[in-house]
Regions:
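Positively charged n-region of N-terminal signal peptides that target proteins for export
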Residues: 1-5
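Bacterial N-terminal signal peptides
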Residues: 8-16, 20
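Glycine/tyrosine- and acidic-biased, solvent-exposed loop/turn segments at the edges of beta-strands
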Residues: 19-143
Length: 143
């Protein structure tokens, strides 16, 4: 019985270690400079680093197909950027702390398009929402 248990552990142990995913800098300098970093969940960042954080220009590609190309500050989307979702939804504009924040354009997969101001991910301020059928809602938005 002990031999069976030992054999089982011997065969199981490599599988446990092989299935473990580690975060790693796979290219360049992920301390200060430009590099490629793969996160433990499979998300990939290619771009500029400062003090081991995403800072400057970069591309963040999530495992679900969502992709952000733009500016980062302290590991967050901050500044100008483009966020494209797998389903076709797309935001081009300003970000703050990973939120749509400031001026931007949000295009939905069904063709609707909002151009205007955002605050913390919501329409807020002057903006225009155009529907596929031609209807236009224009004005001051508030959340």
């Amino acid at each position: 019985m002990k031999k069976v248990l030992d054999l089982f552990l011997l065969l199981l142990l490599p599988l446990v270690f092989c299935s473990t995913v580690f975060a790693a800098c796979i290219e360049g300098s992920c301390l200060n400079g430009k590099g490629t970093y793969i996160m433990a969940n499979g998300t990939k960042y290619v771009g500029e680093f400062k003090d081991k954080q995403m800072n400057g220009q970069g591309t963040l590609t999530y495992t679900n197909g969502t992709k952000y190309v733009g500016e980062f500050k302290n590991n967050q989307m901050n500044g100008q950027g483009t966020l494209t979702y797998k389903d076709g939804k797309k935001y081009i504009g300003e970000f703050q702390d990973n939120w749509y924040h400031g001026q931007g354009t949000l295009t939905y997969k069904d063709g609707r398009k909002y151009i205007g101001e955002f605050r913390w991910g919501e329409y807020h301020g002057q903006g225009t929402l155009t529907y596929v059928n031609g209807r236009i809602d224009n004005g001051i938005w508030s959340f």
